[in-house]
């Protein structure tokens, strides 16, 4: 994911990565 809030699966695991 590159900051997209559509991949809840990937974003949930690397939420911190997407946040920063």
Curated annotation (Swiss-Prot):
Q: Where in the cell is it found?
A: Mitochondrion inner membrane
Annotated membrane topology is:
Single-pass membrane protein
Report keywords, A-Z.
Membrane, Mitochondrion, Mitochondrion inner membrane, Oxidoreductase, Transmembrane, Transmembrane helix
Q: Which GO terms describe its cellular component?
A: mitochondrial inner membrane
Mention one GO molecular function.
oxidoreductase activity
Q: Does the keyword Glycoprotein apply?
A: no
One GO-annotated biological process of the protein: oxidative phosphorylation
Q: In which tissues is it expressed?
A: Liver specific isoform.
Pathway the protein acts in: Energy metabolism; oxidative phosphorylation
Q: Does the keyword Cell wall biogenesis/degradation apply?
A: no
The family annotation for this protein states:
Belongs to the cytochrome c oxidase subunit 6A family.
Q: What does this protein do?
A: Component of the cytochrome c oxidase, the last enzyme in the mitochondrial electron transport chain which drives oxidative phosphorylation. The respiratory chain contains 3 multisubunit complexes succinate dehydrogenase (complex II, CII), ubiquinol-cytochrome c oxidoreductase (cytochrome b-c1 complex, complex III, CIII) and cytochrome c oxidase (complex IV, CIV), that cooperate to transfer electrons derived from NADH and succinate to molecular oxygen, creating an electrochemical gradient over the inner membrane that drives transmembrane transport and the ATP synthase.
Self-association state and partner proteins as the record states: Component of the cytochrome c oxidase (complex IV, CIV), a multisubunit enzyme composed of 14 subunits. The complex is composed of a catalytic core of 3 subunits MT-CO1, MT-CO2 and MT-CO3, encoded in the mitochondrial DNA, and 11 supernumerary subunits COX4I, COX5A, COX5B, COX6A, COX6B, COX6C, COX7A, COX7B, COX7C, COX8 and NDUFA4, which are encoded in the nuclear genome.
- This one is known as Cytochrome c oxidase subunit 6A1, mitochondrial
Q: Name the gene.
A: COX6A1
